[in-house]
Amino acid sequence: MTEKKNTERQLTSVQEEVIKGFTTGYGITPESQTDAAALRREFLDDQITMLTWADGDLSFYRDITKRPATSTVAKYDVYLAHGRVGHTRFTREIGVAPISDPNLRQKTVNMKYVSDTKNMSIATGLVNNIEDPMRILTDDAISVVAKTIEWASFYGDSDLSENPDAGSGLEFDGLAKLIDKHNVLDAKGASLTEALLNQASVLVGKGYGTPTDAYMPIGVQADFVNQQLDRQVQVISDNGQNATMGFNVKGFNSARGFIRLHGSTVMELEQILDENRMQLPNAPQKATVKATLEAGTKGKFRDEDLTIDTEYKVVVVSDDAESAPSDVASVVIDDKKKQVKLEITINNMYQARPQYVAIYRKGLETGLFYQIARVPASKAVEGVITFIDVNDEIPETADVFVGELTPSVVHLFELLPMMRLPLAQVNASVTFAVLWYGALALRAPKKWARIKNVKYIATGNVFN
């Protein structure tokens, strides 16, 4: 039998080019699109896939009443108390009671200024686009301004400034600062329960309010629903063999009335450090942080916080930009009653003056850094800001705001409703800004309550 042998043919360079020629391939650049690939049309789907939040994710901004303002300072009166009640109102037969006046005070709210600026070259609008670039930029600016207003309505702080004068910061005060300090409940990392909601409703009721709404991250609402699954069962069956199980809790009947529950997908987003955010050229230099464990009796750390590295990062914020996060400062806590002292040194070399520092602590479950405090630059002594962490704010927890959402209790003053302003054109591009001027007014601080450090379903996929 003749044995067949496999022989390898050596091809010339010309033959190799002929064999390889006229295959379309996957190249998408002129250098890689040769021969048949040079004839291939590019395909771009005409649908843009949204991978971030949209207007529908905003709840508080959509629900709250907006009132016009006609000055940069809005004034309003608050009725704090009636006249005296009780024994002194009883009199003898021919007597009259002593004079007793009601207690009224005047409050003020300073308007603050929110804007977002966009720029687009003229050529961008002339080419064949799948969507109108100007419409995309305008919609994005409106969404950014609305989201900023909603975030500040919860967490804004007008004292975050290098100026020690009260209210000199750029932000307006939010609910976390305006709510009466006696109306703050600490869940200490536990789940939201019916008892906590009832306790909050009692606080609101003692302020002569009626709680109507509760705003919380969706992770808190989902955890609240999970607690009901073993106590309440709902099975919905169609005409066949299919069944749907589970339910959603949209409201709660408290001791003071019905409370609508709103689960937000974006409420806590700005409280989490985005370490991949691009730094602007005018951003402040990053801070230097030193963490020290100190003896004390005010610490409120939990068992799970002990014997592990507790890690901190700090971001320096100016009017226009944020610094890169500082290097990690860590300490091992060995006693729940102790406290952590952070010494934050602000770099003397900066292009923009720092206004405050944001302090973050690492969560145990996700590994993300959660904001635990913001300290104004006015608190610095010789360039060093000192902060004491006693676990007053726990990472990977959230806030629940419960209160009376009526125009007589809380609303937004609007000096300038949201508008689009064309800016000066100095080159072949179009620049515009979307503006909003106003502030949050909480006329009755005791008619709202805050439940802090509430457990929620934390996720690691927060940022794209």
From Swiss-Prot:
Which keywords belong to this entry?
Host membrane, Membrane, Transmembrane, Transmembrane helix, Virion
One GO cellular component assignment for this chain's record is: host cell membrane
Q: Where are the transmembrane segments?
A: 423-445
Chief subcellular location equals virion
Residue ranges annotated as propeptide are 1-20
Indicate where this protein resides in the cell: Virion; Host membrane
- Taxonomy, superkingdom: Viruses
Q: What is this protein called?
A: Putative major capsid protein
- What organism is the protein native to? Enterococcus phage phiEF24C
